[in-house]
């Protein structure tokens, strides 16, 4: 993160507060480029970790750093994760309902992901082509329609079920830009959410909901050790969305407009740029489904998957 800011954001010189910069001691920040290079205009993060594993002070401090980047015209995009309502490696774990701490088990209360829980980044969930979808001209042409469903994949080696991560932060309140969307989802899913709450899986903390958007998370072809293979997950979704934003930034720069920076208020202000994903859900902590994909924003696929041309039309006019 240090490399993304100019020197005025490098912080204090008190080593008990911030690292000394520049620092000539072994392991110091001698080689960092804080203040020496122009920061990238889009940052894509294919990483997620249990929010509960970090202190509130760390989460808030780091989230403010993301906000600073947004104010500098840098868009920060992160994959929501592939472990549904669990978080961590090997399919993820859940929270102890009694303590709220990591239970190191696959049952209990939903465990939100970091950094997707930060309201100042754009979280990207996962979709896939509907397995049983019949070709439909209407689906191909109707504004906002989708032949996608929420991402779900069973690992061929570990036999673990992976689904698009989504849920609600236990540390950050829902920001103003998404309150109406989150409220509509909770109202639409009231009966289901009440069952999840009664079973100890979910507690309505009024937290920031994620993901914000979603994109294809299946069948990415890569070369591994000289052989072609396919991979799955939102670690592919996030950089594809980041590429779209980079292209839109280029179009804005041609018009002498600034880069977009923090995206979310503009995305939530108009859902017309997205294909609404209403099929599927995610899983975790003994709940199947956990959260469901629904019309409008949902805690599985967010606002839906972007249509590039419509997204360009929306974001090219942002001041």
Residue positions per predicted region:
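Polar, glycine-rich mid-to-C-terminal structural blocks
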Residues: 119, 123-176
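Short, electropositive, low-hydrophobicity segments enriched in small/polar residues
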Residues: 85-88, 129-130, 237, 241, ...
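Substrate-binding/charge-relay-adjacent region of secreted/lumenal peptidase catalytic domains
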Residues: 1-86, 90-123, 172-230, 253-255, ...
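A short, structural micro-pattern
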Residues: 37, 115-118, 143, 154, ...
């Amino acid at each position: 993160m240090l490399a993304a800011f100019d020197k005025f954001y490098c912080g204090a010189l008190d080593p008990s507060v911030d690292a000394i910069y520049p620092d000539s001691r072994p392991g110091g920040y001698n080689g960092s480029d804080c203040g020496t290079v122009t920061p990238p205009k889009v940052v894509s993060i294919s990483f997620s970790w249990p929010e509960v594993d970090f202190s509130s002070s760390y989460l808030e401090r780091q989230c403010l750093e993301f906000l600073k980047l947004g104010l500098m015209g840098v868009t920060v995009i992160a994959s929501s994760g592939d472990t549904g309502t669990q978080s961590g490696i090997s399919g993820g774990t859940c929270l102890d309902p009694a303590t709220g701490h990591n239970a190191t088990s696959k049952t209990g209360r939903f465990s939100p992901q970091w950094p997707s829980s930060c309201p100042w980044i754009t979280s990207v969930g996962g979709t896939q082509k509907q397995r049983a979808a019949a070709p439909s001209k209407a689906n191909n042409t109707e504004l906002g329609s989708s032949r996608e469903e929420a991402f779900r994949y069973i690992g061929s080696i570990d036999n673990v079920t992976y689904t698009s991560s989504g849920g609600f932060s236990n540390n950050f309140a829902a920001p103003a830009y998404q309150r109406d969307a989150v409220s509509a989802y909770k109202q639409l899913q009231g009966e289901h959410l009440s069952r999840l709450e009664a079973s100890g899986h979910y507690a309505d903390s009024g937290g920031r909901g994620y993901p914000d958007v979603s994109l294809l998370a299946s069948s990415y072809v890569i070369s591994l050790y000289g052989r072609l293979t396919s991979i799955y997950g939102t670690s592919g979704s996030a950089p594809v969305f980041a590429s779209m934003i980079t292209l839109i930034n280029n179009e804005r720069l041609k018009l002498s407009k600034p880069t977009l920076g923090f995206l979310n208020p503009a995305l939530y202000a108009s859902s017309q740029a997205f294909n609404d994903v209403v099929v599927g859900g995610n899983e975790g902590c003994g709940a199947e489904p956990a959260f469901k994909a629904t019309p409008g924003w949902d805690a599985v696929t967010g606002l839906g998957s972007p249509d590039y041309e419509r997204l360009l039309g929306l974001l090219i006019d942002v001041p």
